[in-house]
Amino acid sequence: MKQALLVKVLDKRLGNEIPLPAYATDGSAGLDLRACLAEPVTLQPGETTLIPTGMAIHLSDPGLAAMLLPRSGLGHKHGIVLGNLVGLIDSDYQGEVMVSCWNRGNEAFTISVGERIAQMVIVPVVQVGFEIVDDFDDSSRGAGGFGSTGTK
């Protein structure tokens, strides 16, 4: 099922010289976001910078949010991940989508104009209210945390 997403193009190169965000394959969960830079940016080891995507989005549906995730190849091969590890865009946000890129690697890395820098996944959201209780119903796991279910 495809649903329309309101996108405002802020950089006129987007959709022309720089492709619009797109799914790489029919089975892709994430849209590839691209760097809308005036010129390439070199990230030194340990450095973080905000990279513009050239677009603003407005999800408008409180039952949706957008998550920004790193591209696995950039992280594994070059140490380029998101500075905030995961980005979360609320349904009522209408500003430019920026990607915080962090070079956690040992070598400088240059981000080229139009390079795919992150993935955006649209996810359902359920807003909850709290109900105060004295106890929970029993479960097989109980209060077991960190490693309590074993390694096998």
Swiss-Prot record:
GO MF term list: dUTP diphosphatase activity; magnesium ion binding
Pathway(s) where this gene product acts: Pyrimidine metabolism; dUMP biosynthesis; dUMP from dCTP (dUTP route): step 2/2
UniProt keyword Acetylation present: no
Cofactor(s) this protein cannot do without: Mg(2+)
Keywords assigned: Hydrolase, Magnesium, Metal-binding, Nucleotide metabolism
Chemical reaction(s) catalysed: dUTP + H2O = dUMP + diphosphate + H(+)
Pfam families for the chain: dUTPase
CDD domains linked: trimeric_dUTPase
Family note: Belongs to the dUTPase family.
HAMAP family: dUTPase_bact
Role, per record: This enzyme is involved in nucleotide metabolism: it produces dUMP, the immediate precursor of thymidine nucleotides and it decreases the intracellular concentration of dUTP so that uracil cannot be incorporated into DNA.
Listed name of the protein: Deoxyuridine 5'-triphosphate nucleotidohydrolase
